[in-house]
């Protein structure tokens, strides 16, 4: 009996060992399968990366083949050399980088305000895209908070989009955003809507918010000074909760029909419903940029407000100098408040001071100046805002330069075209890859005095342009025969010549891409009165300041006007801001704005 029990016990033990062994074999097999799958996946992923790198390498060559141009022997030798260098760059910047262990594929999809990553947007390589970057990464700047921001009290700024073309809309938006930052208020973006001339195509987005052009979320995340929310969020948070009151009666007023989402609504609905409501519950400033400068005290202390009031009184008691007094004679950027005020006075009648009444308002609303009670903000932010503290002034100019820039999709599309342009120039034997550019404004432009014929424009610019050189023309002229005289003296290209590099890009972005391509030209000719030309010139100022190019200390750069005749070389002189502000951009927006960063610590208040 005992022997049988021992035998049975041994059998059970043997059976258990066998079971354990089978389980171990099964688990080992599962692990091996998983490893094989991962290796196959990595191999496929690795191969895809190589294919992607190969496509990036060859997209410029494919584009050049379409031009069907003959190349000289010297050009071919140069191209062979460039191709070898291109392959070396690919090895370093693409293939080896793609093979790094533990690299998260989602990293390529992350947008950032620092630098420019074109991988998620169809190229070009970052090595080629880096020339687009005029903005700087200044961590200490990101910590600055307006001393006018009220502790523990949420305040807002709302505004109505300008009804003009894109660059008028952008200009007004920049002004409003900088005011929100200066006031320490949350900026409320208007709803997504149709914008003038940005409504092309029924199969693509044709109504927009500013977040479709600028990295609003990233700006708000990176910058302690600015909070940005949508109109829908604002109306739900403050309107439906009964926190908004009629400015005149003090009674609680809810949004019309309790509606909060106006995205995609027509202009009439937005105007009659939403904007009328905001004008009812918000304090609407009567400030007119043509008549006054929007002045901000250093702090909310009544003593600082008094300083601005005394400055205003001083200006009223003397004859203020005209802009001619400051041509090529700017004050230092750290000059006294009164000197800086004189330089930017521009024949206005006084200061509009952000005093206690405005500082205490829960909501300030800027109404568009056509039918509303506010003034149209057709003015550059730096021509309207005045800061008692010069360091706050240069900080604000850096804020715009370093943060309010086009989204990566637009930047990268322009970078692809610029790379193709430079390789085109090199293929003709010019190793520098430099091209020149025009912005020729015609179309619906109301300033007919600038409507010169082609021969007049060629004659005005001949001295500065390179004979037979490559010229990029940004234009709204639809009649291609207008440019036949240009083709006789230059290798002329347009945005349409690079459509193969813009597949999948919303055509409503083409104007912005045009401006970025023109901004990187060696010599640029634009049109007086055009805000499109103006923005190109500001971008060129940013680039020249970063590169420490010739004349950067005075704000000069290698740009001209083909119209008007008497203003051709205005950008080779320092001009202070003057009316009409929108007609051009001024060097005060980019000149020496990095001065004083090292002493900025006392203003950088980190409230995180």
Q: What name fits each language-model region?
A:
Residues 15, 21-32, 40-48, 54, ...:
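Secretory-pathway glycan-assembly enzymes, especially type II membrane glycosyltransferases
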Residues 1-15, 47-56:
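Short, low-complexity, Lys/Arg-enriched N-terminal segments of secretory-pathway carbohydrate enzymes
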Residues 203-207, 479-491:
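Short, aromatic/basic amphipathic alpha-helical patches
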Residues 197-198, 447, 477-484:
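Short, charged/polar "capping" segments at the starts of alpha-helices
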Residues 551-608:
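Leloir-type glycosyltransferase catalytic cores
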Residues 445-474:
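Conserved catalytic-core segment of nucleotide-activated headgroup transferases in glycan assembly
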Residues 490-521:
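Donor nucleotide-activated moiety binding/catalytic core segment of transferases
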Residues 174, 194, 509-561:
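A donor-sugar binding/catalytic signature common to diverse glycosyltransferases
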């Amino acid at each position: 009996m005992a022997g049988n029990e021992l035998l049975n016990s041994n059998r059970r033990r043997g059976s258990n060992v066998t079971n354990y062994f089978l389980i171990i074999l099964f688990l080992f097999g599962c692990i091996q399968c998983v490893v094989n799958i991962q290796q196959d996946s990595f191999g496929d992923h690795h191969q895809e990366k190589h294919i992607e790198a190969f496509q990036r390498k060859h997209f410029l060559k494919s584009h050049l083949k379409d031009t069907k141009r003959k190349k000289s022997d010297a050009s071919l030798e140069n191209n062979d050399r460039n191709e070898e260098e291109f392959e070396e760059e690919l090895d370093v910047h693409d293939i080896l980088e793609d093979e790094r262990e533990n690299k998260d594929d989602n990293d390529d999809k992350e947008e950032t305000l620092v630098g420019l990553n074109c991988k998620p947007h169809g190229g070009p390589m970052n090595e080629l895209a880096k020339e687009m970057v005029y903005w700087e990464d200044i961590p200490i700047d990101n910590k600055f908070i307006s001393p006018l921001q009220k502790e523990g009290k949420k305040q807002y700024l709302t505004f109505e989009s300008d009804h003009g073309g894109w660059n008028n809309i952008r200009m007004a938006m920049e002004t409003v955003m900088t005011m929100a930052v200066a006031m320490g208020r949350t900026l409320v973006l208007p709803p997504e809507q149709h914008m003038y001339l940005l409504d092309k195509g029924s199969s693509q987005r044709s109504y927009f918010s500013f977040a479709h052009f600028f990295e609003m979320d990233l700006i708000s995340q990176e910058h302690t000074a600015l909070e940005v929310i949508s109109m829908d969020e604002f109306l739900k948070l403050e309107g439906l909760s009964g926190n908004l009151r009629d400015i005149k009666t003090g009674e609680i007023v809810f949004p019309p029909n309790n509606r909060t989402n106006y995205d995609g609504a027509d202009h009439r609905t937005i105007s009659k419903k939403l904007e009328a409501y905001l004008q009812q519950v918000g304090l609407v400033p009567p400030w007119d940029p043509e008549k006054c400068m929007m002045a901000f005290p250093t702090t909310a202390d009544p003593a600082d407000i008094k300083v601005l009031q005394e400055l205003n009184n001083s200006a009223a008691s003397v004859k203020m100098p005209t802009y001619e007094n400051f041509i090529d004679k700017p004050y230092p950027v750290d000059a006294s408040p009164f000197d800086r005020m004189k330089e930017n006075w521009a024949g206005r009648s006084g200061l509009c001071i952000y005093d206690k009444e405005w500082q205490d308002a829960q909501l300030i609303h800027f109404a568009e100046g056509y039918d509303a009670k506010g003034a149209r903000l057709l003015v550059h932010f730096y021509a309207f805002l005045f800061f008692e503290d010069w360091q706050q002034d240069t900080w604000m100019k850096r804020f715009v330069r370093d943060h309010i820039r086009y989204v990566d999709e637009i930047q990268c599309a322009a970078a692809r075209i610029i790379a193709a342009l430079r390789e085109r120039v090199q293929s003709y034997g010019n190793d520098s890859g430099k091209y020149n550019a025009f912005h020729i404004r015609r179309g619906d432009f109301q300033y007919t005095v600038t409507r010169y014929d082609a021969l007049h424009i060629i004659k005005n610019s001949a001295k500065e342009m390179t004979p037979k050189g490559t010229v990029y023309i940004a234009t709204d002229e639809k009649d291609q025969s207008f440019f036949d005289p240009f083709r006789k003296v230059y290798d002329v290209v347009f945005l349409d010549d690079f459509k193969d590099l813009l597949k999948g890009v919303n055509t409503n972005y083409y104007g912005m891409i045009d401006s970025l391509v023109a901004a990187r030209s060696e010599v640029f000719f634009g049109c007086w009165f055009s805000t499109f030309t103006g923005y190109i010139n500001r971008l060129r100022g940013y680039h020249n300041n970063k590169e420490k190019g010739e004349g950067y200390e005075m704000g000069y750069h290698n740009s001209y006007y083909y119209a008007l005749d008497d203003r051709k070389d205005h950008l080779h002189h320092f001009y202070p801001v003057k009316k009409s502000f929108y007609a051009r951009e001024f060097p005060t927006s980019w000149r020496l704005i990095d001065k004083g960063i090292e002493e900025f610590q006392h203003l950088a208040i980190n409230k995180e």
